[in-house]
Amino acid sequence: ASDVYKRQPDMSMSINTNTFLNTLMSKIFIASRAKIKVPAKVSPAAVPVAALGGNKPFGLNAYNTVIAIGASTGGTEATLQVLKDLPADTPGIVVTQHMPEGFTKMYADRLNRLCHMKVKEAQSGDLIERGQVLIAPGDFQMKVVRVGNRYSVNCYSGEKVSGHRPSVDVLFQSVADAAGASSVGIIMTGMGRDGADGLLSMKKKGAFTIGQDAESCVVYGMPMVAYNIGAVVTQVSCSNISNVLLKHLYSL
């Protein structure tokens, strides 16, 4: 699997993004079929105590927070790096990763094996709950909607937005509308600008926003645009995103 993310594409070249992503996902599929021993579940001892905030409980305001993550090229492993360091009772997370139909279920299952939180491919009507991560299904848009004092997701076959379905902009804009200041947006490695405008909407509504830095990105595209338009509150390395997120949640 070592060749999957080895080379960073030249963004100055004319690239058929869909072809590139499909090739990437095919490699991920091949890698996932390799006979590599993987623990059924990560042991809590494997996560640094500092990353877990000393196992102290989150406050009520934290549990009312919606965490949204958006990523593209290189994002499958980057998102794993963030999620695996979060404790099992972390507030609900929604993720849009650019992936073709048929791959997101497999990806969610892999994350579920490797993370403390429960991870599943999202279905319309799924509630955003403590300890659970919902992955946008391939070839579907995913929005967050408010249902009373709770949040759920709506997955639908709409038009492509920012050239993508699922689109990070669709997710982030819906979180801005539904949760406003009670949300966190994280934009990670990826080509293009999908998610930048949606993250700016979140920030304008009072959300805390995090961008992955250039050094740790496979492609510093989406986070770069978000940073340049003022959508990012703090920009950090992929390995530090979980710590920054937890520090924010414990402060609520």
Report the location of each language-model feature.
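Short, small-residue-biased leader/transition segments that mark boundaries at the very start
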Residues: 1-5
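Conserved acid/base catalytic micro-environments in cytosolic active-site loops
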Residues: 6-252
